[in-house]
Amino acid sequence: MKVLLVTMYFPPAGGGGVQRPLKTATHLPALGIETHVLAPDDPKWLHRDDELRPPTQAFVHRARYLGPRARLPAEELHGLEGPERILAQARLAYRRVLLPDASVTWLPTAVPAAVRLVRREGIDAVITTSPPVSMNLIGAAVKRLTGIPWVADLRDAILWNADRRFDRTAVQAKEKALERVVRLVARKADAVVAVSDTISDEVRHFDPAGQVRVIPNGCDFDDFAGLDYRSGERFRITHAGSFFGKRNPRPFLNALASSGLEDVVARFAGGLRQADEEWAAGLGLGDRLELLPYLSHHRALELQRDSEANLLLLPDAAGRGAVVPSGKIFEYLAAERPILAAVPPDGAAAKLVRETGAGIVVAPEDEKGIREALIGLHARWQAGQLSNGYLSPEQRRGLSREARVEELAELLLSL
């Protein structure tokens, strides 16, 4: 069997969105499925990671990208004043009117490239992975033009997205366009793969024509091979990843400031938004706060492994934060260091932390609960009682990325 995987994010792009398509393309060939990948040639990535390499097992193809820069609005405006800031805001306004998202500008080159590959290589099925939501439009177009089955892989919800700022008029205006995409996926995809039950429920709400399966993200244990934990002189708690949407570090920062713990250092790999940096400065945290720039994937894994604990922050956002256990939690689980999870208590991430015994769950806005959890982890560290490897062999196998890709392969072969 031959498949074409269409993704906006692929090495040398960096960031969390790269890992699922990268690992899919890495492991599918070992299961007897010839894998072709179509990715942009230069999408002006939000992050670039030259240490990440495309898998040699897959055939990687590129289609020209002519769209806007893939940067967060806050980063686009950071440090700009006067006319430069006005021009940057105008560019952002252009991005915001593109429906369903700015990456729709890749379609004029991506769709013809995908169709050529299908016909030239004898592709049997196309997989699109989103976000960006517009990747689903490519899948629908390829199916219509070639007749091959389409599998829509949803790494995040299309409508029920906890990180989207629903209080903003521009976002509300996009809701109808996004609903049309969900309806398209439900009506046209031969199969839908979702990383959580709640995302699959979003599709089922629109009476899908094809099968819907939940295949969560997985742990890449091999990525941590050779990375060691060495107990530090201070209690190091690490957050890896960017802050966007409603993700809010302030309850944790307040809890740290009021904890009375002077030998704790909170490391934020990827930094904070400017407003949150200013907030943190007002708390007088001093050397208890370490802000690091965007790091390569490998360096971020080193930090996660060599930490007394890792910090997971997910917003509630009127219940939408329960939708998906961020891919970051699987990195944290693979690092096998305790997790302080400030997440919706009834959500998928909280369930994973509890089931694996990986750490402590508190509500994302519960400063008192976060402070008590931090003090408790610190006390266990002082007593030499922090676990270093808490997953059983059965849990490791069930959570592994290889097991997840095997499920996808089974689905593909059934089409």
Model-inferred region functions:
Residues 270, 275-301:
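Nucleotide-activated donor-binding/catalytic signature segment of Leloir-type glycosyltransferases, i.e.
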Residues 190, 304-323:
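Acidic donor-binding loop of glycosyltransferase active sites
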Residues 23, 115, 134-137, 141-145, ...:
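Membrane-proximal helix-turn-helix segments that form the acceptor-binding/catalytic region
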Residues 198, 218:
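Carbohydrate-associated surface elements
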Residues 39-109, 116-118:
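A conserved catalytic-core segment of Leloir-type glycosyltransferases
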Residues 1-68, 191, 212, 259, ...:
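N-terminal subdomain of nucleotide-sugar transferases
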